Amino acid sequence: PEFDTGIKEWLNANPDKLTNNGGNDMVAAVTAIGYDAYMTALEALKLAGSTDRAAVLAAMPNVSFEGVTGPITFNEIGDANRDGAFIKTANTVDGVWDFVKVQTVG
């Protein structure tokens, strides 16, 4: 919720940003996930202290931070330690995506 509010404030503060977002302040379903992916790469680059591909890959299991979608950590082989999925359904009446809930597995 805080992420959505922050993005909407950022979009509405500048007419050009709002126009580039399709003329509205809707937040796409994958925005938060994309943000966390970007921040994950940034954290791996910082830990690696290099842009060398092998060094960044080797740093991935050590990435650990609080993302907007929850804690971001990886196991020793580089798989994300996640047990949830963000599920939305297509609302064909209104033409929007409806958030169902965060689904957990395990």
Regions found by a protein language model. Name each.
Residues P1-G106:
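Extracytosolic ligand-binding ectodomains
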